C-alpha cells in the first residue's frame, strides 16, 4: 500500500505530460501576412530569392520570417531558432544552394516516419514568401552561433 501512494501522486503529472507530448504534432500552422514582401508567384523557387535583398526590404523580410518562425516552427525547432532536441536546429542550415535545397525539400514534403507526421507539408499552409522569409531570418541568426 505504501508503494501505491507515491504512484498516485505522480499519475496526474505523468498524464498531463503525455498530453503535451501528444499535442506536439497537432499544431495548426498559422497564416502569415506577406503583403509587404516581394511576391514570388506560385511555382516553387529552388534558391532563396530574398538572400541578396538589402535595406528596408531585407528588414521587412527578416521581421516577417522571425514572426512566421515563432508562430509555426518554434514549438518543435526551438525558440529563437535554438533547438531543444526535438527537431533539427535550423540555424545550421547553410546560406547556399545546398541549404536551400534541404529546406525546400523539407517544407514541400514534410517529415513522416512510419506513418506518423512529425512535420506537415508547410507549402500546403504557408506561402512561398512566408517560407523563404523564415529561411532568410534563419540565415540572419546563424552568424550568432
Residue ranges of model-derived segments:
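Short sequence/structural segments immediately N-terminal
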Residues: 68, 143-145
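Extracytoplasmic/secreted proteins, especially bacterial periplasmic and envelope-associated proteins
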Residues: 56-60, 64, 68, 85, ...
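Electrostatic cytochrome c docking/interface patches
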Residues: 29-67
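Bacterial N-terminal signal peptides that target proteins for export
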Residues: 1-9
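Gly/Gly-Pro-rich "capping" loops immediately C-terminal to redox-active cysteine motifs
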Residues: 64, 78-108
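Axial heme c-ligation environment in periplasmic c-type cytochrome domains
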Residues: 24-32, 84-91, 109-142
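The canonical Cys-X-X-Cys-His
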Residues: 65, 69-79, 119, 134-138
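Bacterial N-terminal signal peptides
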Residues: 10-17
Amino acid at each position: 500500500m505504501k508503494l501505491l501512494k507515491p504512484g498516485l501522486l505522480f499519475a496526474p503529472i505523468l498524464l498531463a505530460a503525455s498530453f503535451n507530448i501528444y499535442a506536439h504534432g497537432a499544431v495548426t500552422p498559422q497564416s502569415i501576412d506577406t503583403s509587404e514582401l516581394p511576391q514570388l508567384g506560385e511555382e516553387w523557387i529552388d534558391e532563396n530569392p530574398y538572400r541578396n535583398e538589402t535595406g528596408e526590404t531585407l528588414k521587412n523580410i527578416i521581421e516577417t520570417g522571425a514572426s512566421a518562425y515563432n508562430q509555426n516552427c518554434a514549438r518543435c525547432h526551438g525558440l529563437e531558432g535554438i533547438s531543444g532536441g526535438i527537431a533539427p536546429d535550423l540555424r545550421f542550415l547553410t546560406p547556399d544552394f545546398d541549404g536551400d535545397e534541404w529546406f525546400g525539400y523539407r517544407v514541400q514534403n514534410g517529415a513522416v516516419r512510419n506513418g506518423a507526421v512529425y512535420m506537415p507539408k508547410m507549402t500546403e499552409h504557408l506561402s512561398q514568401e512566408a517560407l523563404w522569409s523564415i529561411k532568410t531570418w534563419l540565415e540572419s541568426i546563424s552568424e550568432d552561433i
